[in-house]
């Protein structure tokens, strides 16, 4: 568990040698300015100016999250005016980077709730705490929090833990998404190899009575690019709905789709994503967190952004690498 967690945290950094280059100058609802970002600006920022990045013309809104105490957000769900973010405490020692779950009003940036740590137990096994919190999705059962070796079901309003399942190897919870059949995709991150998403029926998980989710319960799998940090099921650029994946390091972001599509430049440090309606793509970025800003040289961008993807077909290609 600790070794995998070490790899996951290292994966969030990746190769930091390829910064984004010139920003986009086309029309759109963005780019937004520093003063447009909702919520209280982090006190640790050394500038009151947002950095530009390619395709930032599509950024319509931003929200500052409370990352001054070390919170590094990884997953996001948005419904109505509320956003839920999962992540970990980046200031803690590596083996103690337990999950944190927060709930925000995206219209004001106010934090509405917090679960820290996320703790529970698999059946009658020993109590434990969640680690990393790499993926977050929601369906009719509630919030599904994916971590390295477990899957958590959490009530959205109270943030109470409902149930916990263990992920049996080779399953690994690095990121997650929900597909058009309402299956949950549990994504495995690898530093140098392609990622993989294994699909599961959540009704089957809840109704089965099992404590361990195994690969045999999967209804299929999807290949994902190397360095995938987050995924979303979306119909982008006039194409049928399919999984799209955020490949990122804190200075670069790339959005990659099906094999016959071209990659697009994306939010630096992009992690989890959630599509609301047809054109509003909410994206978590870890680049603007205290954990990475204090390392120096990372772009200043809001930790939560909403992008208009209505002109996605014309978005620029990436000019940086991960």
Model-derived features: where do they sit?
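Beta-strand-rich domains and repeat architectures in extracellular enzymes and scaffolds
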Residues: 59-99
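Blade-loop segments of beta-propeller domains
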Residues: 72, 100-102, 109-140
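Short coil/turn segments that connect the beta-strands within blades of beta-propeller domains
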Residues: 80-81, 140-141, 181-183, 236-241, ...
